Amino acid sequence: IIKVAGKQSWLSEVLRTPEDWQLLREARCPVWLLNASRQPIDKVIAAVSTLDESPEHSTLGDRVIVQAEALAASLKVPLQVVAVIPDWNASRAAMAYVPPIPAQTVYLGDIGAQALQESRERLVAILERLDIDAEKAEVRTGTLTLEIIDAVGDQGLLVIGSAAHRGLAGKFIGNSSEKVLHHLKADMLVVH
């Protein structure tokens, strides 16, 4: 499905589920949402999660990367595979109580560095399994929406997966693709 992305106010999104979100949740095929500008695509960004290791998310991540690689090859533009993990030093989690571990001192900075390293290793392993150059991997720390939007820029094409939360979870939690869509200025392909 190819559709021009609609823009709505934040209040409108709270009061009623936007049509684009409904389409992303219900479609059984990939959905390509076009931005209003007609600028040529200069790169393809595959956004995947390295934090959720469930079989469903792993399969979805593989589909996202394979689809993004095919698009980058056909458009003759670079491919970049991006994962985002929370910034432990800047998040509210950094102020949370960390229970002591016997005979060990725990530093949140160390936890963040370890999470970043593990995320990089997972992403490289995924790319190697899919026979894609590991140099295309990038793990960012920060807020998912802001980091993805920064990676894509104004002329990129974002390829992202949607596991489609439904019901109250969909209303209050939402999906990463929906959160990014609200702020993205570039095209987005959502893979299910």
Annotate each language-model stretch with its function.
Residues Q22-A36, A186-D187, V191:
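Short, acidic/small-residue loops that bind anionic groups at enzyme active sites
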Residues I1-I2, K7-L11, A125-L158, S162, ...:
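Structural beta-alpha unit
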Residues K43-V106, A113, I132:
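Small/aliphatic-rich secondary-structure junction motif
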Residues K3-Q22, I41, L157-H183:
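Glycine-rich, Arg-bearing micro-motifs that act as flexible, cationic patches
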Residues I65, A113-V124:
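Short, surface-exposed alpha-helical segments at coil->helix boundaries
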